[in-house]
Amino acid sequence: MFCVQNLPRSSALPLQSFKSHQRRPPCSVNTLGVMSNVNLHRSMAVKAISGPTSSAETSDANVEEEKSETYSTNMTEAMGAVLTYRHELGINYNFIRPDLIVGSCLQTPEDVDKLRSIGVKTIFCLQQNSDLEYFGVDINGIREYAKTYDDIQHLRAEIRDFDAFDLRVRLPAVVSKLYKAINRNGGVTYVHCTAGLGRAPAVTLAYMFWVQGYKLIEAHNLLQSKRSCFPKLDAIKSAAADILTGLRKKVVTLTWKNPDCTTLEISGLDIGWGQRIPLQFDEEQGLWILRRELAEGCYEYKYIVDGEWTINENELVTSANKDGHVNNFVQVFDDNPDSFNANLRKRLTGDDPDLSMDERLKIRQFLESIPDEEQ
């Protein structure tokens, strides 16, 4: 029998805990899901490939296509929407506002020139080193080239790919850095992750919601009218509530009664779909057990039993996404559902959240107070 327990012990982390939180790099990729194509971009900047190609060039192109297909497959399953990224086509982007662009990653130093030509003053990269290495992007070469100009700045603020909880926890520090860069550099800001379909849209939405005065749904509708993408809105909502109420945690215990299996792991929760945590077998109880501190919020997860991904049908299960995938999930609540903080979090994590003038001012002041990260 598998059960979920919310134990009474809890902890509250001060707002300062957001200062420079860094997460581990991801492990390989998730292996569930099916890839499908979607019309992503209404306006694109595409590399032109012309003339005869050698067998080596053809082989390299095939490798790039295979990497893109693998990445798209994993993005589709992790984001819960059918998404495609073609790295071999070059950088692509969309203006969301006259001063804000969301796009895919820079691939060569020449991409810096492309962005300078459209008025970009800040290039804001959300990729981790592992993301760059996967597609063979020379980030150091790009950054060094950008430094040869005095009218554009390249900044990095890493968020782990395919990880909604890392996005939630990192958003305050990342948006703080973006906010300060925009105030300092002016002009047009180019926000990108790898494909420009998850992390970059989410950071841009958080900035529009927290700083520019948009309601979240209004900002999201504007974004979708310019660029088809799938930002994790729940992470943005929870991050806003975390700033205003503090990041409170509770211990959650997951148990599974299956003494016949050899290994039992869990993926999702607060570690993302690219990583796994092993459950420990308690011989006395005959149970596989995992105890983990989780912040308030909703967490999806799956089990890997002797290498096979599965859910427990006796526990809470999400609705099927477009590809038919379902996950288990657990909701972590405040011990006092009638408290001011609980009601504030409930409002901010609802379907159509908005911030009062006072709440938005507090968030801006908090963003300004976060020490600058390197890079």
UniProtKB/Swiss-Prot annotation:
The record places domain Tyrosine-protein phosphatase at: 92-249
PANTHER family, A to Z = DUAL SPECIFICITY PHOSPHATASE, SUBGROUP, CATALYTIC DOMAIN, PHOSPHOGLUCAN PHOSPHATASE DSP4, CHLOROPLASTIC
Transit peptide as UniProt keyword: yes
Q: Where is the signal peptide?
A: none
Q: Does the keyword 4Fe-4S apply?
A: no
Q: Where in the cell is it found?
A: Plastid, Amyloplast; Nucleus
Q: State its role.
A: Starch granule-associated phosphoglucan phosphatase involved in the control of starch accumulation. Acts as a major regulator of the initial steps of starch degradation at the granule surface. Functions during the day by dephosphorylating the night-accumulated phospho-oligosaccharides. Can release phosphate from both the C6 and the C3 positions.
Q: Which domain of life is it from?
A: Eukaryota
Record's Gene Ontology CC terms? amyloplast; chloroplast; nucleus
Q: Which InterPro entries match?
A: AMPK1_CBM, DSP_laforin-like, Dual-sp_phosphatase_cat-dom, Ig-like_fold, Ig_E-set, Prot-tyrosine_phosphatase-like, Starch-Glucan_Phosphatase, Tyr_Pase_dom
Cited Pfam families: AMPK1_CBM (PF16561), DSPc (PF00782)
Name used for this protein in its record: Phosphoglucan phosphatase DSP4, amyloplastic
The alphabetical list of record keywords is: Amyloplast, Carbohydrate metabolism, Hydrolase, Nucleus, Plastid, Protein phosphatase, Transit peptide
Q: Which residues bind substrate?
A: 194-199
The free-text domain note is: Contains a C-terminal polysaccharide-binding domain which interacts with the phosphatase domain; this interaction is required for glucan phosphatase activity.
Tissue-specific expression: Expressed in phloem parenchyma of 16-24 week old seedlings and 2 year old trees (at protein level). Expressed in leaves of 16-24 week old seedlings and 2 year old trees.
Species of origin reads Castanea sativa
Residue interval of the organelle targeting sequence: 1-42
